[in-house]
Every structure is written in structure tokens, then in C-alpha cells.
Amino acid sequence: MGVPDELPPGSSETDTIVSSSQPTNRSPMDLISEAESLNLRRIATNQSKAQCRPGSAAVPSHDNPPNDDLEDATLDPNSASFSLEKWLRAAVSDASQHGLSTPSGGILFRNLTVSGSGSALQLQPTVGSVLTAPLRFASLLRHRRIEPRRILHGFDGVMKTGELLLVLGRPGAGCSTFLKTVCGETNGLHIDADSVLHYNGVSQQRMMKEFKGEVVYNQEVDKHFPHLTVRQTLEFAAAARTPAHRFQNMSRDEFASYAASVVMAIFGLSHTHNTKVGNDFVRGVSGGERKRVSIAEMALAMTPFAAWDNSSRGLDSATALKFVQALRLSADLAGAAHAVAIYQASQSIYEVFDKVTVLYEGRMIFFGPTGTAKEYFERMGWVCPARQTTGDFLTSITNPLERKARAGMEDVVPKTPKDFEIYWRQSPEYKTLLGEMTEFETQHPTGNDEQASAELRARKENSQSRNSRAASPYILSIPMQIKLNTKRAYQRIWNDMSSTMSTVVGQIVIALITGSVFYDSPNTTAGFQSKGGTLFYAVLLNALTAMSEITSLYSQRPIVEKQASYAFYHPATEAIAGVVSDVPVKFLLAVAFNVIMYFLANLRREPAQFFIYFLMSFTVMFVMSAVFRTMAAVTKNAAQAMGLAGVLMLALVVYTGYVLPVPSMHPWFEWIHYLNPIYYAFEAMIANEFHGRDFDCIAFVPSYADLDGDSFSCSSLGSVAGERMVSGDSYINFNYTYTYSHVWRNFGVLLAFLIGFMAIYFLASELNSSTTSTAEALVFRRGHVPEYMRPGYTRPTDEEKAVTQSDIKPSSPSPTNTDLPLPPQRDIFTWKDISYDIEIKGEPRRLLDDVSGWVKPGTLTALMGVSGAGKTTLLDVLAHRTTMGVITGDMFVNGKGLDASFQRKTGYVQQQDLHLETATVRESLRFSALLRQPASVSIREKHDYVESVIEMLGMGDFAEAVVGTPGEGLNVEQRKLLTIGVELAAKPKLLLFLDEPTSGLDSQSSWAICTFLRKLADSGQAVLCTIHQPSAILFQEFDQLLFLAKGGKTVYFGPIGPNSRTLLDYFESNGARKCDEAENPAEYMIEVVNAEVNDRGTDWFDVWKGSKECQAVKEEIERIHEKKRGTAGAIEETDDGSTKSEFAMPFWFQLYVVTVRVFQQYWRMPEYIISKGALAIVAGLFIGFSFYDAKTSLAGLQTLVFSLFMVCALFAPLVNQIMPLFITQRSLYEVRERPSKAYSWKAFLIANILVEIPYQVLMGILTFVCYYYPVVGSSQGPDREGLVLLFCIQFYVYASTFAHMCIAAMPNAETASPIVILLFSMCLTFCGVMQPPDALPGFWIFMYRVSPFTYWVAGMATTQVHGREVVCGENELSIFDPPTNQTCGQYMERYISVAGGQVLNPSATAGCEYCSLTVADEYLAASQIYWSDRWRNFGLIWVYIGFNIFVATAVYYLFRVKKWNGRRKK
């Protein structure tokens, strides 16, 4: 949706656009750009014209705007005096008259007291602590009951319709808990019984039950379906809340489209309407635009009360201001009330709000109008420094290190949170608040909940569709919700068609491979095993394709939960829609796979049999989809669901009835096949294939010429003496105990499974859709808990955090410790005419344009710019961290070009705080120091320096805390301090780069970080730091500024000057407006540059290029180069020999340190190691006792080989366990450690491969014990047992190296998984178990020889059964009568001499019993498996392991290290 080519007649381009030169008191309409204003007018005009069309419900005249007021020309989109704001108000008024208005949002809370569960202290679990847990059972029981921690203490307040409340407080003050509580998000929280909380008189309990969606909590994370476009996302939201009576009698579809168009215009999204929303993996709109989509979606929810928890994080001040102004617009036009927590609120943002509340460690210390808050605290005795914003001042009051008392008031002002609360409750402002609350309660009495909700209910019922339940909180009826969700599901499929088609192509490839393995199976007894194998593969591959649905359902669960909380739909209706939309996709998959498979394998060429086969395949596909969807719905996380699915898959495959036929099943597990849907499908498909058919026998016993009478028998099961044909029904009865009469019974059973699992899935989706929240806590290593957190030690702590933020704030340096132990800085880094070009969609785009500058030791340089100007891009280019594009220009150190050591000698503090989750703070710092400081520095000195950094950053209290994850580990500020600390621990010799070090921090934490950077610079460090929009005070800490406009164009580089005077003089003297005394220079500058031209119409970039300041920069760069070239020789002489090397430490030291760290990581991840062990033990025991005491009959030998086949089936889950962990390690290495030249990629890869091996050896031992002794027993000698143990260990080692080979070059585990499945299934299919090598088509024989499982199965099988005597079962014997006057032995002597085997009753003259084998080796020889090859096979697997390691190394180097543009990444 672009801007119309021409305006409606009489319109002015500048209507309703307020001058941007006013720093304060902006209109809420400011957030609507000029282009979007025109767009809104076009929508209004089109709507007016739509109402004038013949046949429309209302036919007003051309000048009849939405509110039917003929006289008001400001409401006519075609009028010169058209007012956008008035038109929107009129539209809301018109909507109100038609039942479209939202209920007014008002809330009152009195004595609101909230407690949280969870310990303030957690200990890091390790493999050791988990294994020794039984020994600590009594201690665990004693500490099981944890007293609830009080988070909020007696809050009082009221918000009326159309009000905005700003919630201020430092991290841990209770802001999030407060917002969650007032919105009913109380999972893991407990509200005291004495607390009063109601919405216009309606209790929270009734609100959550009947009017969910009227009160909404918005987290800072944007959750959307990535493949939907912006318009589709917003039209869905509008359709879900479309009322029964619609604006100007539109249809539902018209209203949804119209409402989406309006909000896209209001929030500046019209240009993105056809762009995917996207996410971290799917390309879509920008992060800021995605945030606006979230805001627009919530606006369409038409909720009267909303809470926003730090939703502006990551936005610059200008974008954050637009966000808040959007809320202002929503409040003004729709009467909504919004509570917003913002960490860094500029003055402009602050002034948009009506009320503000200040929280201090769980206590409310102010609640009232924004205009009186500053005066209140100044009257209390606190001083607000000049140019500090009101928001920063109010937050600073809660930090003892930041607040300043007025002279003479130091002993009078409150000190503790409790003191502040007492002062507040005694103040006249509090009494005014109580009066306001009393007045609100008079208007909305709380005594009669039913009466208070009557108005809400009436409005809701007026909006609800015809068939909706009156008590339902949803506007749409359930059938309409299903219809809407189904439409969206098809949109998602269509927008991601490549994924669907790749799945179809994958199924076709698998069908071609599998079908060709069993190609043209003969319609004789020789085809019995091939046909059975074909149908077994067919039913399994149809059934197990649905397993991937678990991950897709988990990826969408947060979105469904969010939209259910907005009262868009029942989660169950989304689940139903997902199943419905899957029908055509699954049908396409079934056709693609089954048609190819069926005809390639030469299954029964009869129409009825083909359609029965297809019906069973399609049905079992849906049944298993329901099973896996149910698993996803009843579990709490994807790991649980996948673990459960892995165990279930093993049970389903074993008890399908093929690898372990029903007669061979043991009573303790036999019951499983009755609960196995695949069993019923397989029986039906086998019976369907073999019923009513007679198969020619191709092998007779004995195979003499001129056989007649009953003197011979077919060698196949189900044969009858003297018959040359074998009945298919007889064969399946003897081999499987299957019968054709069960076919339609089994179909009925499958339908019952389908209905049952679908019902559980829909129910679980509805009831298990909420996630619980836990209190935040620090995690420490056992034995390293700091003294202040041990029981009995008293120290003020924040109830919401494990440690208060003030406890871990980097304190101001004491007078005795002002000098930092930094290396002396002598080098100056300069860059000249840097440009950077990349190619986007085939077109070149310039991101940086002739940027020049320098960073000198002892200076703090700020890098700023408008949103999208290329700040981070410039930092990446200067730090040599770009991997694509063309860079032109020059970079120098002391006037000389950069060498290989440049990246090692610079520190780069990235915006993302990436650290190893299992390491402690001290370990993270030591790792950096050990590898990045020169080899000439001893390990002791490196450790001592780390302690200095810990003290420098004030991290002593949590130095032994584990990094962890947000919520269980370091908080945002602590992570940021650690990120800075890691770079300082490396002792950067040249300079320190920092990218947005204050992003996501509150203003006090930002101040602490910047003052620390100032301290670093004063100690001689060179610092270059990007920053969004600092406060005026914070801005003054910097020495120099490099400011970029859009396109990476320089508009200023130079000193800032006292009170920013040098900078302001430059802009004011070149045509910018005067900067107001009270204005923030940083905000002023953004505003001036955003205008793109000065008052003379000249572009600021051109102004800079023609300025004397620009010329001075070029001259200074040349002067630096000349001066430094003269002293370079002296400097180089003092450097040690390793100065110019790529890495600071030798390779073997790197490998040692990295390997130790990875070992530590594995030891501290008990869930990973225990899950590996559980898989090995549970799968080993299950297979072992399923194939327990394998007999040496023909069926017993076959089941023993199939037991090895099932052990091989563990390969895929083993590999899938390893890959995600490797991705985590690699992300940390490639994003932070490799660019810093901490250690080589070879050390990284080798360490990760090495550390897996000991655990894989352990898993092999566990599997050997659990599998071998139940199946084979302990009768074999230690040499045979030892070899089987070696094969088991080898299998696990091979799996780990195979995983590294597959994942090494792949971007993520999801991409690598299909490759793993394809390679694994190929290896398994061609290993000789399912189809002996002699039966394979000639083309595929090479795969039999290539498959590593061929040699592993052969080695295992022959070692287990070599030399064992075969004892045929009764149904395996060939029974026939010898000719007259001959015994069975005499009659069979000639045959046995050629074919082998044994006659069990040689002296009998009738009913000869012949067994085709004597020893097990003969059975294996038919598959080319020989005892003499066992050690060769063992050796060949090691060759495969070596090959895996080689390929992993090669592909990692080729695809992730080597640059293909001629340069190498080192």
C-alpha cells in the first residue's frame, strides 16, 4: 500500500502534521507520517465512496462523512479543511453507535500485596550432584518447603478511562510483577486475600473468566507467525474481534480489511503490508516494524486495559516516542488505559503520560500525576541535576549511589525503601490519591460483582456473533473461530510453499529409494520377505512423517497462547484448524509416497487392494499425527515431547509385528502391540496383499527331479506336503498369525484411535496452554556461595531478585584505587574514506559513505546516528568483523596498515551478551585472559589481572555465580558487565569497541556503564562506543562524536565540547534551529539530522563535506600518520616476537584450555548427560527384554538380527541429541571468540569431538550390559563378550563423529536433521537386514558395501551366534513322506550333501522332519556374513569414524572459515 499519486481534491499535504521543531507537547498525531496521513485519507475517501454505491445499506450524499454531520467540513476527506484526527474520532463515535465501542478501561487496586515462590539462591546442578542426590534425600526433604517471598507490599492506585500510567523502577523493583498482576497473569504468583483489585467494579476472577481479552499483558518479545504478511496478521486480529454490528454495515471481510488498513496507516506499516512479518530465521520486516505490528495487533484486540512490560527495549528514543504516542492515540480515541514500564524514558516520552508510579524494591513510593512527581521528591529533599530528565531523576531516587540530597537535608530524607513508603503514605499526594480512589469506588462499587459486570456483559453480547455462548469471553462462535483459523492455516501453508514442496520432494525421493530396493518383488515364495519388508517400510514411513509436527507445534505455542489471552479464539479451535488444513497436505504426501512405493515394489496390481492399501496408509498417517500432536500438547517443553516420542517410536517399531512377529513376543511386553496403531495398519496391509492368492514355490525339499505325491514340500512357511503352490493366507497365519477377517476390524480400531487421540489433543491444547513464571534467582556452584547469601547472614535484598541491583552496581572508585592496571596505550587507530557496499536482491547498496576519523588513547568517542544509519556496520567494518560486501578506504595503526594481530589487540563488546551458560563469571574472565593475553604473561599474572577486572567492575558479589539463562542466572545488567569484563580481561592493546553497551539497561545502569567507560579512558584506554540516544548528562561524558546520517554519511566528527557547545555551535552556525537550554543535545541533533536538510535546503552530508571541520579531520589524520611513522621503529623494537601473530597462545595450549572448558560444560549439563544415559539404558533394556533369550530357531536367528537392526535405529536420536549442543557452542565461538582471535577453529572442532568420546564410551558400556545379557546370556566366553562390548562402544563413537560431520557446516540443527535422516535411512536400508545383498537390484549393491551398518551388524551378529546349533521350531520344519521302502535319512542323504541342513527323524519311514540349517553360521552366510570377517569389520568402522572427522574438518573449513572471494578468514 503506497502513497496515492495525487491527493483528494482540496487536500493539503501538511494537514494535521505538527511541526517537528517543537521539542515538547507534541500532538499524538505526530507519529503518523505525511505519507500515511495521505493513505488514511485515501481509505476514508474510499469508504465514503463505498457508502454511496447503489445497493449499499446506507446511501449518504458525497459530503456525508462517517458521523452523518453534513455541516462539518473537517470530516469530509475531500474538503480542504479535512482533519484526520477529527475524522478518526468521528469514526470511533459512529462505531460506538453501532455497538463497536470498547468498554472503558479503569482499574483500582488497594493494599495490593503479592508473593512469589522460588528460592533466592540456587545451586548449579552437575552430573555428580544428580547421581548423588539419593544420598542427600533427607536434606532435600527438609529444604523442600520454601517460604514465599513477598514481592509487592501494599500498593494503592487508580487508573481511569483514557489514562496512561508510566511505571518506573530499577530492574528488580517489582515493575514486571505489578504489570502481570493487574493483568491477571498470576502463574507462580500469589495475591494476598486482603488485596482489592477490580476493573470498574468487576473482580479480577470474573474478568479473567468472562472478559478475558479486556485486560491484556504484553511482553517485550514479539511473537508472530513469521510466514504471514503484515496485512494477513492484522486482518486476522481484526476478524477475530469483529463485532456483530459493524461500522457502516460492512461485511465481516470488509471490516477486517478496513480495520487492518487503518491501523497500518496509523502505525506506519502500509508500505510493509505485503511483506512477511519474519523472525530471527525468516526474512521479514525490521525489528522496529515488527514491534509496531505487535502494537497494531493489540490495538485491533480493542482491549480497554493493557500493560506493556519494557516493550520499547531495543528501540531508539525516537521510535520509543512513536510507540508511546501510539498508545496515547489509542487512549484518546478509544478510551483505553495503558500501564507502561520503560527503563529509559526521555523527557518527551515522560510528558506523554498522565500518571507515574515509582517502585523501590517492591514498595510503591509515589503514584500520581506526572506533573507533580518531580516537585514531590524535590520537596522531600532531593536535588534534580540540570538537564536530567524527570524519568531519570525519579528512578535515581531508588538508587542510594545516584540520588543527591539537598544541602542540610542529608539526615532528614528517607533512606530505606520502607522509609520512602512511610513518607509517601503521610504525604498530601497520597491523601489526594485516596480521595480519587474513593470517588472511583463510588462510581464503580465493588459490593455487587454481578451488577458491575452487567454493562461489560451487555456490550460483549452486543458484539458477539449469533451462536456464541453468553458466558464466553470470545466474540466469535466456535465454528467461526475454526473457519478463521483454518483460513490462516492455509495462508501459512501457501506463504511457505517451499517447505511443503520440499517435504513432498523428500517423500518422493525416499519412495524411489525404498521402492527400488524392493523393486519388482516376484509373485512367488521368493518374494515373501520382500513384500513383508516393503509393507513394513511403507507403514512406518507413512506413520513417522508426523514426528516433525512436535517441533512445529512448539514453535507456534507462544503465539497461540498470546492470541488466546487477547480472546481471539479458543486454543482448541486453532488445533482443529491445524488438523483440517493438514488434510490436503497429508493427502499430497500420501499420494506422492504410496503410489511410487506400491508400483515400484510390484505389490498387488488390483484396484480394490490398492485402494485398501492407500486407505490404511492415509489413516495411519493421521492417527500417528494425532499421537504426536497429543504429545506436544500434554508436555511443557519440546525436549520432553521429543524424548517421549523417541521412546514411543522404538516401542511402536518393535511391536508392529514384523521385526518381532506376534508368536515371538514375550508376555511382559506383548500387551504393547494391542495399543499400537501401526500394528493394526500393518496387519491389514499384509492381509490385503496376501489374501486369496496362491504363490508358486521356487524351492522344494528335496529338489529332486520327477517328484510326486507327498514326497516333497515347499521350503516356505505355510506349505503343504505335495503342493507346488503356497497359500498367502496360510503363510501370513504361520508367520505372523494374521488373518484377512481382521482388515475392516483394524480399520475401525484405527478410527477409534484417531477420534480418541484427537479428542485428547484438542482438550490438552485448551487446558495446557499457559506457561508458568518463576522468580528470578542467581545460581552458584556448590561450595562457592558468597557469604552474604548463606543462611543466617542478614543484608538488604530485593524480593524479586536474588541479589539487589544496588548490591552489584559497579561502585564509584575509592580514593585509594583510582588507577586501573591497564597496559600503557601508545597506538592511534585511524581510518580514511571508508565505504562499504553490499548487494541486496541483485542491486548494490551503499551502507557507509566516505567515513573518516580516529580514536586516540585516553579519549572516549561516541558513535551515533539516526535509526538505520549504519552505526553497528561501521563498528563491524573497523573491527574487521564483516563477512560479505566490498570495503574501500584505508585503516591504519600509527600510520601503517593492519597486520594479522589487529583483531586480537582490540576488544569488541557486542550488543548481544553471548556467554557460555554453564561457566561462572570468574571462569569466563579467566578463559579470555588465558587465551588472549600474550604468552609472555604468566598464568598467575593473568589470574591476578582477572581479579583486578572483577574489582574494577564491582562484580565481586557474583564472581562465582553461573552465567545461566535470563531468569535463572545473571540479569541484564550483570550480563552486560560480564561482556565488558571479558574484553577488558584480554588487555586490548589498541582500543575497545562497544556496540550499544546501554541497550536494555535502566538509566542508572547506563550511567554506571558510561562513567566506567569514562574512567577507562582517563586511565589511557582508547574507546569507541555506539549509543542510541543518551541523556544530556550521559552525553557529556564523551570527548568526541562521530555522527552518521542515513546511508552511512558523516554529518559530524569532532569534539563535543563543554555543555556540548562545540557540537551545537557547528549545527546552529550551519542552518539548524537554536537548541533550547532545557533540551537534550543528543535528541536535538537526531531531530535536526532527521530533517535531512538545513534551513537553506542543503543536505547535512554536503554541509559536512564542505565545512572547515571536515578539512581539519583530514589534515589531523595526515599529521598523526607522519608523526607516528617517525616513532614506529622505536615502538617495534620493544615488542616481543609474538606481537604480530594471529593468536596470542600456541595451538596446544589453546586446545588444552578449550577442551577443559568443554569438559566442564558437559559435567554441568546433567540433563544432557542423563538424557543420553536414559536413552542408552531404557532402549537397551527394552530391546534386550523384547528379544529376550533369542532362540537358535530360524525365527530366533531372524529376530536376533532384527534386534541389531533396532539398536541401529537408536542412531538418529543419538545424533539429534548432539547437534543442538554443538550449534550452541559454535554460535558463541563464531560470533564472539573467533573474531577476537581467542583460539583457532581447529582447537574448537577437536575439543568438541574429543569431549563427546568418554561419554559415548560410557553409553556403549551401558547399552552392552542392558542389551547383550538379556538377548544372548552369559554363556559365551570373555573374548566374544569383549568384542561385542567394543562394537557397542564403537557404535556410539561413530554416532558422535557422524553428528559432527553432518552439523559442522549447517546453519542449524533443523537444517541438518533432514540430511541426517536421509543418510541414516539409506545406511539402515542397505545394511543387508531388510533385503539380503543377493536380493538387491544390481544398481544398489554399491550402497550395501558403502553402508557402515553393513559391517557393524555383520560383526555383532557373527560374534553373538557363531557356532551355535540351530533347532528349528515346529512351524519351520518341512514335513513330507519318503518313497516306499526308504527311510527319511536315506531319502534325504543326497540332498543334504548338496544343500545342507538336517533330518530330525532319519530312521522314520513317514512324516520326515527336515530343518534347513545345522549351525547359525549357515543362516548368516546367506547374507554374506562370516565369522572370519569380524575383526576386519571392527577395523572398517574405525575407518568410517576417521572419515567422519576428516569430512567434519574439511566442510567446516570450506564453508565456515575459508572466504571464497580470494581472502581468508583466519
Swiss-Prot record:
GO cellular component assignments: plasma membrane
UniProt membrane topology term: Multi-pass membrane protein
Chain ranges passing through the membrane: 499-519, 533-553, 583-603, 608-628, 642-662, 747-767, 1168-1188, 1195-1215, 1244-1264, 1283-1303, 1312-1332, 1434-1454
Positions contributing to ATP binding: G865, V866, S867, G868, A869, G870, K871, T872
Domain of life: Eukaryota
Gene3D superfamilies according to UniProt: P-loop containing nucleotide triphosphate hydrolases (3.40.50.300)
Family, as annotated: Belongs to the ABC transporter superfamily. ABCG family. PDR (TC 3.A.1.205) subfamily.
Annotated PANTHER family: ATP-BINDING CASSETTE TRANSPORTER
Protein name from the UniProt record: ABC multidrug transporter atrA
Origin species: Emericella nidulans (strain FGSC A4 / ATCC 38163 / CBS 112.46 / NRRL 194 / M139) (Aspergillus nidulans)
Gene that this sequence comes from: atrA
